[in-house]
A protein has these predicted regions:
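Conserved GNAT acetyl-CoA-binding A-motif
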Residues: 116-129
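A short beta-loop-alpha structural element at the N-terminal edge
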Residues: 2-16
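Conserved acetyl-CoA-binding loop-helix of GNAT-fold acetyltransferases
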Residues: 101-114, 118, 139-140
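A short helix-loop-beta-strand connector motif used in the catalytic cores of GNAT acetyltransferases and
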Residues: 43-58
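Conserved acetyl-CoA-binding loop of GNAT-fold acetyltransferases
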Residues: 139-149
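Conserved acyl-donor/pantetheine-binding loop and adjacent beta-alpha core of acyl/acetyltransferases
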Residues: 52, 60-92
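Conserved GNAT-fold acetyl-CoA-binding loop/helix
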Residues: 22-46
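A short, internal acetyl-CoA/4′-phosphopantetheine-binding micro-motif in the GNAT/acyltransferase core
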Residues: 60, 90-101, 128
Length: 159
């Protein structure tokens, strides 16, 4: 497996990963990808990918992307689900279904944390449903609960 920085050419793959992240529960209906990506809150996570404050890493196997951790700065006027402040990028995490539960998400998270620190960020945030198994992975790499909204936690990690 190779891990590399995300770039503007990864836009389509990141949209696919955003769909996977947004529809993480296998019991939920699988709406068409474009229907999900067109939701106003989801558009905040992908429109104009590559703008200042965007970053992330991609996992590849034999040159084919299989997972991503990417982050974006949000504003108080248009926050993401895990918004903490305008200086803390919010992280999204997704791995292709066939490659899940193999440690790829944690490896990608740690790589993204290093990259974000090198870019001068001091913290990263995220939002996770309380019943999402990924919550335990986030805790293992250092994220801590800083808020709760309905059935989701806002988590933060110091870099």
């Amino acid at each position: 497996m190779n891990i590399r920085p995300a770039n503007k050419d990864d836009d389509d793959f990141l949209k696919t990963m955003l769909y996977e992240a947004a529809r993480w529960n296998p019991d939920w209906p699988r709406e068409p990808i474009q229907e999900v990506l067109d939701e106003p809150i989801q558009r905040r996570y992908h429109e104009g990918w590559g703008r200042p404050g965007d970053g992330g890493v991609i996992a590849e196997m034999e040159g084919v992307p299989i997972g991503a951790v990417w982050y974006r700065l949000f504003t108080a006027e248009e926050p993401g689900y895990g918004f903490v402040d305008e200086k803390t990028p919010e992280v999204s995490v997704a791995v292709e279904p066939l490659h899940r539960r193999k440690g790829i998400g944690g490896t990608l998270l740690r790589a993204a944390m290093v990259q974000a620190r090198e870019e001068g960020y001091r913290t990263l945030s995220l939002s996770v449903a309380v019943h999402n198994r990924s919550r335990m992975m986030y805790q293992r790499v250092g994220f801590e609960k800083v808020g709760e909204h309905g059935d989701s936690w806002t988590m933060l990690v110091n870099l």
